[in-house]
A protein has these predicted regions:
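All-beta strand scaffolds that present successive hydrophobic residues in beta-strands
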Residues: 11-16, 36-42, 61-67, 87-92, ...
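Surface-exposed loop/turn segments connecting beta-strands in extracellular beta-rich domains
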Residues: 21-24, 46-49, 71-74, 97-100, ...
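Extracellular beta-strand/loop-rich repeat segments of large surface/secreted proteins
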Residues: 252, 256-370
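Short, small-residue-biased leader/transition segments that mark boundaries at the very start
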Residues: 1-4
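A generic tandem-repeat structural signature
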Residues: 10-75, 79-81
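Intrinsically disordered, low-complexity terminal regions
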Residues: 118, 130-134, 141-142, 146-150, ...
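Long, acidic/serine-threonine-rich intrinsically disordered regions with weak helical/coil propensity
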Residues: 160-161, 165-178, 183-202, 206-228
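Solenoidal tandem-repeat scaffolds enriched in leucines and small polar residues
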Residues: 52-177, 182-183, 188-189
Length: 371
């Protein structure tokens, strides 16, 4: 069968079907405007460019159970949203994209996914633009983005504002509870030219050997038209809850980063201030808050604006790391080879501004009897 577009006031129920498209822009299932699609136990394959597997835009609503989706073109996310946003709730299923620039999930809507396999074989795993949200529950997420000279770096999940007009400017949200992330190339999380909230809870992460960072929160070189050079940083609230992490956290002075480690979280890495894309600089910061029972294992000299530590900070050999103020004050004298340089330091941790991951039950939709 062909693509199924749904427009104003329309409702469609799709069950035990096969949907295939072989034309540019041929989405599998498409909900638009006041339209709603309910779909279950269906195979969807798209072959050409700009052909999402399941697609919502203009406020459309799409609810899916146990679909098997594969896309093969460029700009063809398996779960795709577009200008005007909408709502997508996915429960179970397998979603695979094979093209360049085709993430498993392209998010310019409010999307929640539970117990699904999400794989991008030729792209980053997730793109989130602007005032939109993606919440993943007990799902397995894989990305394999190729290096590109137009980009400052390579990533697995990006939260950004492209300035294309496809999404309203505002805070991007990424939450993940359980499940796995597999990064086959590049760093893990990259955020630029936006405001965002990232929260991870007990996610099992597999890194590639060339991973350059765990989180990069910086401006960009504007080769892609993402904001104004020297003023296109990111304001990011990052929370790790019962989360093991590995890799550097990179930030710059045109970005604001609040980094919270809670409930026994661990980080093996360094905090690196990199002004490469910060122009003349700004008043940005990197504030790190480490709760009791959380641990930072330092792997290199680090620079932080404010460090609030009620947990444990050592190097990989268990040696105490020196914590020194930019004014020369020694807050902690250690025997490690590494030093943490801070603007301010305290040995307590206020995590009241951290993010609590929402429950799947807040987004779960009852499957219609007709499906």
């Amino acid at each position: 069968t062909c693509a199924l577009p749904i427009s104003t006031d329309g409702t469609a129920y799709v069950k035990d079907s096969t949907v295939t498209t072989d034309s540019k822009g041929g989405a599998g299932l498409f909900a638009y405007g006041d339209g709603t699609v309910y779909a279950a136990d269906t195979d969807i394959t798209t072959q050409q460019d700009t052909s999402g597997g399941i697609h919502a835009a203009g406020g459309g609503k799409l609810y899916a159970w146990d679909l098997n989706v594969e896309t093969n073109g460029e700009s063809s996310a398996a779960i795709r949203s577009d200008r005007g946003g909408g709502t997508m709730v996915v429960d179970g299923g397998t979603y695979t994209s094979n093209g360049v620039g085709s993430p498993a999930v392209y998010c310019t809507a409010d999307i929640a996914v539970n117990n699904a396999e999400l794989t991008a074989n030729g792209s980053e795993a997730v793109c989130i633009e602007g005032l939109n949200s993606l919440r993943l529950y007990n799902s397995n997420l894989t990305g394999n983005m190729s290096d590109d000279d137009q980009n400052d770096t390579t990533w697995t999940v990006i939260l950004y504002q492209s300035m294309s007009g496809d999404s309203e400017v505002g805070n991007s949200t990424f939450q993940m509870d359980g499940g796995t992330i597999t990064s086959k190339n590049g760093g893990l999380f990259y955020t630029t030219n936006t405001e965002c909230t990232i929260a991870l809870k007990d996610v099992d992460i597999t890194y590639n050997d060339d991973s350059e960072f765990f989180l990069q929160c910086t401006g960009n070189n504007n080769q892609r038209g993402w904001g104004q050079s020297g003023a296109n940083g990111s304001d990011c609230n990052f929370t790790a809850d019962s989360q093991d992490m590995k890799g550097n956290v990179i930030w710059d002075s045109i970005s604001d980063l609040d980094f919270y480690m809670t409930n026994g979280s661990t980080l093996e890495g360094a905090f690196v201030n990199d002004e490469s894309n910060a122009g003349n600089g700004g008043d940005g910061y990197c504030n790190v808050v480490i709760e009791k029972d959380s641990t930072w294992t330092v792997t290199g000299d680090s620079t932080i604006t404010s460090l609030s530590n009620a947990g444990t900070i050592t190097d990989a050999d268990g040696k105490t790391v020196s914590i020194v103020g930019i004014d020369g004050t020694t807050y902690v004298e250690g025997d490690s080879d590494y030093t943490i340089t801070v603007g301010s330091y305290q040995d307590s941790a206020d995590t009241s501004a951290s993010t609590t991951v929402d429950d799947w039950s807040s987004y779960e939709v009852e499957r219609p009897e007709s499906l």
